[in-house]
Design a protein with these regions (language model features):
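Bacterial N-terminal signal peptides that target proteins for export
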Residues: 1-6
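C-terminal motif of bacterial Sec signal peptides marking the signal peptidase cleavage site
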Residues: 13-16
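C-terminal/domain-edge helix-coil "capping" segments
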Residues: 18-30, 125-188
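Post-signal peptide N-terminal segment of mature Sec-exported envelope proteins
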Residues: 26-46
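Extracytoplasmic
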Residues: 35, 81-86, 132-137
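Structural recognition of the beta-strand scaffold that forms the well-ordered cores
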Residues: 39, 86-89, 149-152
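N-terminal segment of the mature soluble domain
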Residues: 42-98
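Surface-exposed short loop/turn segments
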Residues: 90-148
Length: 188
């Protein structure tokens, strides 16, 4: 019982320390210091064909997280015709397979290592295939006049199954804030 509890705690700690892989790219010729206002590209989002992403609760959580993050940086939400930049987003869930090599050390015939020839190799390897899901959030920021991309932020992480709605919302907020941490970029 103690082993199971300890294992559960270790798994919880490791999964809690999971970091989102964030990348961003932008137009280095763009003057980001002039950006003050923003608006959503579409009032009605259809961010994915996956029903786990394309539902009202997830869409609202992502939008709220984006707006909170941008407002904390001093950006003001406005109408499309007055915005300095527009925001669009997309989400995806991919099925992935990870191959792990497992090395087994065992003693022959149940006698333990003291009763065998030390020259006899008791090491064996096996490959375990583990399926998992990888989630991606992509934010595109566009110039409203030319409709060209000025900044893109991408966040990816392994999806943890069986989370409560509140935990999913918290993870989405964390992902959005980490992705938008690189916006506006510091151009050198």
């Amino acid at each position: 019982m103690l082993k199971i509890s300890l294992l559960s705690i270790i798994i919880l700690i490791v999964s809690g320390c999971s970091t989102i892989q964030v990348t961003s790219e932008y137009n280095p010729k763009r003057d980001f210091s002039s950006l003050k206002t923003y608006a959503w590209l579409n009032d009605m989002d259809h961010p994915s064909d996956n029903l786990r992403i394309n539902n009202e609760l997830v869409i609202r959580s992502v939008r709220n997280a984006v707006e909170e993050s941008l407002e904390s940086k001093g950006f003001v939400k406005t109408t499309r015709d007055q915005a300095d930049f527009l925001i669009s987003w997309f989400g995806a869930i991919e099925q992935k397979v990870k191959a792990e090599t497992i090395t087994h050390f065992y003693a022959p015939y149940g006698y333990g290592t003291l009763y065998r020839d030390p020259a006899w190799n008791t090491q064996a390897q096996a490959v375990a295939l583990k399926e998992y899901e990888k989630g991606s959030l992509i934010f595109d920021l566009l110039d409203p006049k030319s409709n060209t991309l000025i900044w893109r932020g991408i966040g990816q992480d392994r999806i943890t199954e069986g989370l409560s709605g509140e935990k999913i919302k918290k993870n989405l907020h964390l992902a959005v804030s980490q992705i938008l941490a690189d916006f506006p970029p510091e151009i050198k």
